[in-house]
Amino acid sequence: MEEKVILVDENDQPIGLMEKLEAHQKGLLHRAFSVFIINSKGEILLQQRALSKYHSPGLWTNTCCSHQRQGEDNLQAGKRRLWEEMGMQVPLKQVFSFIYEAPMGNGLTEHEYDYVLIGFSDESPSINPLEVCNWKWATPEQIQKSIAETPEEYTAWFKIIFDKFYHFIAENITL
């Protein structure tokens, strides 16, 4: 089954559906979400993408991210993928959204209207090896330092999203 993404305008109004790979090849704006799980120590759960992924294999990124299905709201989509990728069931809250564009250097471009979702858990994930090859907890400061020192180890979108998320948690969350 081909996975379709929801094409949107800059106001997040749906304008059509397209196969995911084609949307990434054409760099068309589509709806997406990014989940961040934080533990009681203030650490963020990161995943290393499976080596079999068609883009950004083996790179580190946020807890999980994907695309909403037609008729699915952001929180439903986030919970679905958090379970499918990380084997976790965690209440999520939508905290902000923004548009970004990130060429991935292989003829593909992420151009997303991204909803950032947050959840809190001390649970260890039970990863799906088709999606994820490794995971770790890291403080925001450790992540920021690692991105600065080894940016090639992180997905293009995570580097953009993390900067916004870092400022959000610094201003809004007491850990």
Predicted regions and their residues:
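Short alpha-helical functional segments enriched in proximate histidine and acidic residues
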Residues: 85
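Nudix hydrolase/Nudix homology domain
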Residues: 21, 58, 96-101, 108-175
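Conserved Nudix-box catalytic region and its N-terminal flanking loop in Nudix hydrolases
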Residues: 22-33, 40-80
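A structural signal for short, well-ordered beta-strand segments
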Residues: 35, 64, 94, 115-117
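Acidic, metal-coordinating catalytic segment for phosphate/diphosphate chemistry
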Residues: 1-34, 40
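A residue-level structural signature of the nucleotidyltransferase/glycosyltransferase Rossmann-like core
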Residues: 5, 43-44, 135-136
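A short coil-to-beta-strand element that immediately follows conserved catalytic motifs
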Residues: 89-97
